A protein has these predicted regions:
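Amphipathic alpha-helical and helix-coil boundary elements used as assembly
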Residues: 2-354
Length: 354
C-alpha cells in the first residue's frame, strides 16, 4: 500500500500528489505571510460592480485544521488569474469573514470572504454636520479621517478624483444623521450623479509574488473615463479548453416598463414659493411600440426638502440655490429610468474583464 504523509506546507503536499501548484491558473498571496505556505486556493467566485465594490468568496484547502480564523480577518489578499494571453490579472481586497469547514484528516476546507476596503465603512455609524462644503469635499474629509484612524484602510486604499470633470455646488449644510459612513457617502455621491469604482493600482503583474498594492477608489462623472479592454473585440462562441481565446457565451437583451416622466419640486425660501423642475420632464426613450410615453402617463412626482439658503450677507462662500439643482435631479432620475428600461447582459469567460 502507498502511504503519503501530508507535510505542513500545503504546496509541498500538492507536489507530493503529483500536481505543480506554480503552473495553476490561479494564485493567492496574503499580507499575513505565515498563511502563504498553509493555504491553497481551489476556487474563486465573486462580483465587481460600479457603486457596489468587490465581494469574493475564496474556497481554500490546507493541511492544517487548526489555523486560527483570526489570522485571516483583516489580512490583505491578492488573487492572480492567468489570462488567455498568459498574463497575470490581479484582484485584491481585505478578508472580512472566515469559515472553517469539513476535514478528512488530511485536508481542511476554509472559506474566505474578501471585500474591498470600503466594506469597513459599513461598520462605523455617526451623526455630524458639515458646513460650507461640496459633496466631494465631504467625501475627501471622511476618507482622510479613515486614513488617519485605520492603518489597514490607509495601506489598502487611495482616493482618485481624476475622473471628475465638473464643478460641484458648495452646500451651506450637510448632515449625517445616525447613518453608516457607507450609506452617507453613497447618498451624497448619488445626489450629484457621481459614480464610484474600485480599481487596482496594478491590474496586471509580472509575477504572483509581487507585493500587494493599495487599491484605488475612483470617483467618476464622465463616461469617457471608462476604458475598453485592449483586445477590443470578443467572440460570441462556446467556451472550451482547446480555444485560443476567451469568449462571450451568452448574450441577453431585456426591456422593462419604467416611469416615462419625472417631476420634482421643493420650497425655495429666497423667493417664498415652490420651485419646480421644467414641468413634467418626459422621457425621450421610446418604451413601447404599442403606447407612446404620453399615453402611458407613468410619472414620478417628487417633493424634495427645501432649497438651501446662504447667510444674510452671502459671505459664507456657498453656491446660491436655484432651479439648476432641481434640473440636475430631474435629468439624473430620467437617465436612470431610461437605462433601466433597456439593458443587455452578457456571460463570458473573459478573465481580464473588470
Amino acid at each position: 500500500n502507498l502511504i503519503i504523509t501530508m507535510p505542513n506546507n500545503i504546496y509541498a503536499a500538492i507536489e507530493q500528489l503529483g500536481l505543480t501548484a506554480q503552473k495553476r491558473a490561479i494564485h493567492i498571496q496574503f499580507s499575513n505571510t505565515s498563511l502563504n505556505e498553509q493555504v491553497f486556493l481551489q476556487r474563486i467566485d465573486g462580483t465587481h460592480e460600479l457603486n457596489a465594490g468587490i465581494e469574493l468568496q475564496l474556497l481554500c484547502l490546507s493541511t492544517s485544521a487548526h489555523i486560527p480564523l483570526k489570522q485571516f480577518i483583516g489580512s490583505q489578499v491578492a488573487v492572480d488569474i492567468v489570462t488567455d494571453k498568459s498574463e497575470l490579472n490581479r484582484i485584491s481586497g481585505i478578508i472580512t469573514k472566515a469559515d472553517v469547514g469539513a476535514s478528512d484528516g488530511a485536508l481542511t476546507i476554509y472559506r474566505l470572504t474578501v471585500e474591498d476596503p470600503t466594506a469597513l465603512w459599513k461598520h462605523r455609524r455617526n451623526s455630524r454636520v458639515f458646513m460650507a462644503k461640496s459633496v466631494v469635499d465631504v467625501v475627501q474629509t471622511i476618507f482622510a479621517e479613515w486614513q488617519q484612524r485605520s492603518p489597514l484602510f490607509a495601506s489598502s486604499l487611495t482616493l482618485d478624483k481624476s475622473g471628475l470633470s465638473k464643478e460641484y455646488d458648495v452646500r451651506p449644510f450637510i448632515m449625517q444623521a445616525n447613518e453608516l459612513d457607507s450609506e452617507f457617502i453613497q447618498r451624497l455621491l448619488s445626489s450629484e450623479g457621481i459614480n464610484w469604482l474600485i480599481d487596482e493600482s496594478q491590474l496586471k503583474v509580472s509575477s504572483s509574488s509581487e507585493p500587494i498594492q493599495p487599491q484605488k477608489l475612483r470617483l467618476i462623472d464622465d463616461n469617457a473615463q471608462y476604458q475598453s479592454l485592449e483586445r477590443q473585440n470578443i467572440r460570441f462562441h462556446r467556451s472550451s479548453a482547446v480555444e485560443s481565446s476567451d469568449s462571450i457565451t451568452n448574450f441577453v437583451g431585456q426591456r422593462s416598463i419604467q416611469p416615462t416622466s419625472v417631476h420634482i419640486q421643493h420650497w425655495q425660501a429666497n423667493t417664498l414659493e415652490i420651485e419646480e423642475g421644467a414641468g413634467s420632464v418626459q422621457s425621450k426613450h421610446s418604451h413601447s411600440d404599442n403606447q407612446d410615453n404620453a399615453s402611458l402617463g407613468l410619472e414620478q412626482a417628487w417633493h424634495f426638502s427645501p432649497a438651501w439658503i446662504q447667510d444674510l450677507k452671502g459671505e459664507d462662500g456657498t453656491t446660491k440655490s436655484g432651479n439648476g439643482q432641481i434640473e440636475k435631479f430631474n435629468q439624473n432620475l430620467g437617465h436612470y429610468y431610461d437605462l433601466q428600461a433597456k439593458q443587455f447582459m452578457a456571460t463570458s469567460t473573459v478573465r481580464d474583464a473588470q
